[in-house]
């Protein structure tokens, strides 16, 4: 343990990071297909590199026009991110776009369309007809660190990344470029955040910018100060924070020209910043029949309502599925000693209040609609800038009654 206390660090990246470009493209394709055919089965992966975008995967859909328009969808999303000129290292209008998409495997489809419960066990409930699209384990988490019930390090890192993009797009700092990363280190005492120790902000910029006289003071004033001024936290001391702006020096070569990007490579950024466990499955480009995505959203919904109900100060919940089965094969609740009631009772209440079959998750969270592109950057959880159904606190009273 450091003499400065227990230090925990989380990072975020901007929407112009190469991996996040890929997440954004994959989710934009998904949204376009769901808008035209809500029953679309989609698993789209994207790769970007210098001057090229490759979109591959499996899609089964009746949305023929949207499918035919994928190339334009890709270009529009890249341009919206801000890569609109070769001067920035990438141009959505002129980059090469290669599409290589096939149909969903019929072997997978049969397990999703006709679950084991209906196919073998003779279950008549319509929600028993849809099986999990894969085996796997998913985690959800919530903690009372912040009003949005997220761990403070990742919440603060995301706020900094969003602000980096905001000052670039609204012209406050027009010399910034789309690629960027943030990192936040916080000192804890007994799981309570007490001191902001270090903030790292690395941002792509135009070539003619003086790092010491222009970039460093601008980032401190327009990004960090703005975010910290808006941060209301009773226990956190930010008075002596160490700030590192572009600690490698200049950052002109960024985006896909600087690094290749892939869908699904920022799963810790997407979730809880390493504070909670992760089942390993990525989200972007997957329709909600894939429990990697829908069940992780459901677990966040569960965890957030448990904490909001006052049953624990922090909770992590795990669910597990077998491919082709509707009912989960496992549910696990961990409260880390912060519980107000017996964790066994919390687990029982969750089972009574939440239906965690894939079909029920999709129904209860209304997931068969184009809501995914905004989640491709700045996290899937704890968002206050977009209305996401898994962030609702609509089961608090039900949980209290079940306890």
Swiss-Prot record:
Any one GO cellular component localisation term in the record: cytoplasm
Catalytically driven reaction(s): L-methionine + ATP + H2O = S-adenosyl-L-methionine + phosphate + diphosphate
Binding positions (L-methionine): 58, 104, 259, 290
Gene Ontology annotations of biological process type: one-carbon metabolic process; S-adenosylmethionine biosynthetic process
Location of the region described as Flexible loop in the Swiss-Prot/TrEMBL record: 104-114
Cofactor or coenzyme needed: Mg(2+); K(+)
Enzyme Commission designation: 2.5.1.6
Metabolic or biological pathway, per its Swiss-Prot or TrEMBL entry: Amino-acid biosynthesis; S-adenosyl-L-methionine biosynthesis; S-adenosyl-L-methionine from L-methionine: step 1/1
Function of the protein: Catalyzes the formation of S-adenosylmethionine (AdoMet) from methionine and ATP. The overall synthetic reaction is composed of two sequential steps, AdoMet formation and the subsequent tripolyphosphate hydrolysis which occurs prior to release of AdoMet from the enzyme.
NCBIfam families reported in the protein's UniProt record: metK
This protein's name: S-adenosylmethionine synthase
């Amino acid at each position: 343990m450091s003499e400065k206390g227990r230090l925990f660090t989380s990072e975020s990246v901007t929407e112009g990071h190469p991996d996040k470009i890929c997440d954004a493209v994959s989710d934009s394709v998904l949204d376009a297909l769901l808008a035209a055919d809500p029953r679309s089965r989609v698993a789209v992966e994207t790769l970007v590199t210098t001057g090229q975008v490759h979109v591959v995967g499996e899609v089964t859909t009746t949305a023929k026009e949207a499918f035919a328009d994928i190339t334009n969808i890709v270009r529009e999303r890249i341009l919206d991110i801000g890569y609109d000129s070769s001067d920035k290292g990438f141009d959505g209008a002129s980059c090469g776009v290669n599409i290589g998409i096939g149909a969903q495997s019929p072997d997978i489809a049969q397990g999703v369309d006709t679950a084991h419960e209906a196919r073998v066990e003779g279950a008549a409930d319509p929600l028993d007809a849809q099986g999990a699209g894969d085996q796997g384990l998913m985690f959800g988490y919530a903690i009372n660190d912040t009003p949005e019930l997220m761990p403070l390090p990742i919440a603060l890192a995301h706020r900094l990344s969003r602000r980096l993009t905001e000052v670039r797009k609204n012209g406050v700092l027009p010399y910034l470029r789309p690629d960027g990363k943030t990192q936040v280190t916080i000192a804890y005492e007994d799981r309570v955040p007490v001191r902001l120790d270090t903030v790292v902000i690395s941002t792509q910029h135009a070539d003619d910018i003086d790092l010491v006289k222009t970039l460093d003071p601008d980032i401190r004033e327009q990004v960090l100060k703005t975010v910290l001024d808006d941060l209301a936290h009773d226990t956190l001391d930010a008075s002596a924070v160490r700030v590192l702006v572009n600690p490698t020096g200049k950052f002109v070569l960024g985006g896909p020209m600087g690094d290749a990007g892939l869908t699904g490579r920022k799963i810790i950024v997407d979730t809880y910043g390493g504070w909670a466990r992760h089942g390993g499955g990525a989200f972007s480009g997957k329709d909600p029949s894939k429990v990697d995505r829908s069940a992780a959203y459901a677990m966040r919904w569960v965890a957030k309502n448990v904490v909001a109900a006052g049953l624990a100060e922090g909770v992590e919940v795990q669910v597990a599925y077998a491919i082709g089965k509707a009912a989960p094969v496992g549910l696990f609740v961990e409260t880390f000693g912060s519980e107000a009631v017996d964790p066994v009772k919390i687990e029982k209440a969750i089972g009574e209040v939440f239906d965690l079959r894939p079909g029920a998750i999709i129904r209860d969270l209304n997931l068969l609609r184009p809501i995914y592109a905004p989640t491709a950057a700045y996290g899937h959880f704890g968002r206050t800038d977009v209305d996401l159904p898994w962030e609702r606190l609509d089961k608090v009273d039900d949980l209290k009654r079940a306890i």
